[in-house]
Amino acid sequence: MATSFFRRLARSAPITFPVAFGSQSKSGSGAFRFSTGAIAALSGGFSYYYLTSGNNLVYLDQAKEETGPKTALNPDKWLEFKLQDTARVSHNTQLFRFSFDPSAELGLHVASCLLTRAPLGYNAEGKTKYVIRPYTPISDPEAKGYFDLLIKVYPDGKMSQHFASLKPGDVLEVKGPVEKFKYSPNMKKHIGMIAGGSGITPMLQVIDAIVKNPEDNTQISLLYANVSPDDILLKQKLDVLQANHPNLKIFYTVDNPTKNWKGGVGYISKDMALKGLPLPTDDTLILVCGPPGMMEHISGGKAPDWSQGEVKGILKELGYTEEMVFKF
């Protein structure tokens, strides 16, 4: 029954990232931490970190006393989560469901991600080398006993290839959560969102939080860019949300449209932003997440220290200030 539902979800919703980390250091238990800058780099989705560590791994059954009976994640220890099922969503995207204690919630907050890691062999000192990658679950944060990850598999992606190799019953090492952006209901009257590809993931967390809360009157405007219509992750889910919630407006644009495509064509332009985003005011917030090239074009990238940095690109030209823009 659960497997059948999961595969229907994959077919019907082409839907798909971690606790203060200091710079890499070892404790007596072999634990290591990451700098805030490292997390920011990872959270952009385009950098990989190859790190070594002792076996700072705790099995989920062992971790219950430390993490509490209702929260599965641990911000300080890597935990193993078992793969329950997987389903193909598109030519390069798969949906993965991982299970844990059915009485517990994952423990993920709105606009936060978790870290995943996979071994890459050993370094010259004989210590395990890892690739570490952040992902945002697409499942309901309040769901008990499981979480879902939508993974775009790249031919040269070390972490995504690790995901592709997993079979039901295999385990994934996970750590978190990491809060990237603190959302509170009605914090702004109007939130604009610009997403590219899998950059839709943190946007979906915020959208879900707003539309699920009848007391939250925030207006949402989303501009979502992809290569082709087939590459639009979460489109059916987003369309349903838009149809059922008048405070959500979505505009899609693709580089390679099909014959019957009715959305925008090409990169997100100044004109698209002008028509699709709220005007720059003190009650406006613009969230941006996507590939580095898109970020530079829209908002400018983050600063060298991975802080938010100066607002540049289209948003600067339209009058948005640093206080009005958040870059994931």
Swiss-Prot record:
Pfam families: FAD_binding_6, NAD_binding_1
Cofactor list: FAD
Family recorded in the similarity comment: Belongs to the flavoprotein pyridine nucleotide cytochrome reductase family.
Catalytic reactions on record: 2 Fe(III)-[cytochrome b5] + NADH = 2 Fe(II)-[cytochrome b5] + NAD(+) + H(+)
GO MF, one example: copper ion binding
Signal peptide segment: none
Main location: mitochondrion
Gene3D superfamilies named in the record: Nucleotide-binding domain of ferredoxin-NADP reductase (FNR) module, Translation factors
Residue ranges annotated for the FAD-binding FR-type domain, each copy included: 76-184
Source superkingdom: Eukaryota
Native source organism of the sequence: Arabidopsis thaliana
Function summary: Desaturation and elongation of fatty acids.
GO cellular component: Golgi apparatus; mitochondrial intermembrane space; mitochondrion; plant-type cell wall; plastid
Modified residues (Phosphothreonine): T201
E.C. no: 1.6.2.2
Entry keywords, A to Z: FAD, Flavoprotein, Mitochondrion, NAD, Oxidoreductase, Phosphoprotein
Protein name listed in UniProt: NADH-cytochrome b5 reductase-like protein
CDD domains per UniProt: cyt_b5_reduct_like
Subcellular location: Mitochondrion
Entries under InterPro entries matching the protein: CBR-like, Cbr1-like_FAD-bd_dom, FAD-bd_FR_type, Flavoprot_Pyr_Nucl_cyt_Rdtase, FNR_nucleotide-bd, OxRdtase_FAD/NAD-bd, Riboflavin_synthase-like_b-brl
Coiled coil: none
